[in-house]
Amino acid sequence: MRAFTPGASITEASRQKVLQAAEALNYSPNLLARSLATNVTHQVAVFVDDFANPHKLPVLEMLTERLQAEGLLTVLININRHFDHVHALINADQRQFDAVILFGTAFREETLGDRRLGPDFPPMFVLARDSQIPGVPAIACNAELALSQMVDYLFDKGYRRPGFMTGARTLSTALGRRHHYANFWRRKGVESVIELNADRYSADAGAEAARAYLSATPPPSRVDVLMCENDILALGAMDTARSEFGCRVPQDLAVVGFDNIELGATPTYGLTTYEQPTYEMINTIVEMITGARAVEAVTLPGHLVPRLSA
């Protein structure tokens, strides 16, 4: 097996002889058997619970491609009401993954204390959200910097009655965007930020939250700019504001998002948004998993993408 193991103690001449013989016999090493001996499976579990968000798929594509380039197989685990974080973590523990990536999921610290989890649980990483759990580092966009840039941009545009649409409560807390948005408006002298609540991250949820707010609020009292926690909420809110309430965007209501999904760039929306440093975040987390970089929390800067919606 040493001939098939990078860095193993074997001369190059001997390694080549073994590889040539293996090729002639159409032999390849049994990775399952090797994992029993080395306790390394070359498999990484990725937990996802927000499949309605179109930002997820391109990030997953980039993440899996980068992991595969390192010889790591990705196992996708769908977190939902029938298969929660505890079940997923137990499943990951039983399968002896080399690492677990929590992508777009938020869970409670006490989950890690579940007595059914083994003592040698694989290392966990949070991608694209904050983590306050000791030993579970987050690799994320710098939300404070992002919201500072966004509020500066909106303030310079003349907006003074801001609103913010949140998504699912547990995930919103992990994002921290609403908190920073309100803080930076206060620094501008704007004390109140109207909050709209969507119960999930989808265009329908964004439309429902916008409909409830616009129906209950007369035009003179409405916000003049609405930031949505992500782009798909913003697109749903824009559709409803324009088609059901006759709002002109941005003249009557400016709308901004976060993520820079492809649909938001189309002429139909022209959505002002913020792009996360996806490549850099993925590269960082893979380097930590492979041991090429120290394991630690990392925040990285993204960039503002101004368009016609604000």
Regions found by a protein language model. Give the residues of each.
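N-terminal helix-turn-helix DNA-binding module of bacterial transcription factors
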Residues: 1-39
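Periplasmic-binding protein-like
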Residues: 45, 96-105, 163-165, 196, ...
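Hinge/beta->alpha junction and helix N-cap segments in small-molecule ligand-binding domains
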Residues: 48-58, 76-85, 139-149, 165-186, ...
